[in-house]
Regions:
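Long, low-complexity or tandemly repetitive, helically biased scaffold regions used
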Residues: 1-139
C-alpha cells in the first residue's frame, strides 16, 4: 500500500530510528556491554538470556521490515561520506552548545578558570572535527 509522501517520510524516519536502536541493542548484547568515555554499559546478563534477547530483537526487526514492505517503503543507498559528514555536523552542534556562554542559561556561571579551560578544549575539539571533515571531503 502506498502512503502519501508526507506520511511515508514520517514512517520512514521512525523506522530509521528503530533500525539504529535495534542495531545498537544487538551490538551491546553480542559484545556484552560497552566502554565509553563517560559511561560504561556493564553486562549483568548470562549468555542464554542475551541469546534469547537477540532472537527476540531479530523477530522485531523482521516485523519492522514487514511494516516497511506493507507501505512500499524501500531501502535507500546512502553515501558513507554523507553519513559521516552528518555525524560530524551533529558533534559540531553539540559541542557549540557546551560553550560556557551557551551554558549560562542553566543559571550558574563558570569560574573564570573553568570557563577558559572549557572554551579552549571545545575550540580544540572543533578544530579536530573540522580537520576530519576536510579529510573526508578530500576522499
Amino acid at each position: 500500500m502506498k502512503l502519501h509522501e508526507l506520511h511515508a517520510r514520517s514512517l520512514e524516519s521512525t523506522l530509521i530510528l528503530a533500525d539504529e536502536s535495534l542495531l545498537r541493542m544487538r551490538r551491546l548484547l553480542r559484545e556484552a556491554g560497552q566502554e565509553g568515555i563517560v559511561r560504561q554499559v556493564t553486562n549483568t546478563m548470562n549468555e542464554d538470556a542475551r541469546h534469547d534477547l537477540i532472537v527476540a530483537i531479530d523477530e522485531l526487526a523482521r516485523d519492522f521490515q514487514s511494516l516497511a514492505a506493507d507501505f512500499s517503503l524501500e531501502q535507500h543507498d546512502l553515501d558513507l561520506r554523507r553519513v559521516l559528514d552528518a555525524e560530524l555536523s551533529s558533534l559540531w552542534v553539540d559541542l557549540q552548545d557546551c560553550r560556557p556562554d551557551r551554558m549560562k542559561g542553566y543559571g550558574q556561571t563558570f569560574t573564570p578558570e573553568a570557563g577558559a579551560l572549557l572554551e579552549n578544549r571545545i575550540e580544540r575539539l572543533l578544530a579536530r572535527i573540522e580537520a576530519i571533515r576536510t579529510t573526508l571531503l578530500k576522499s
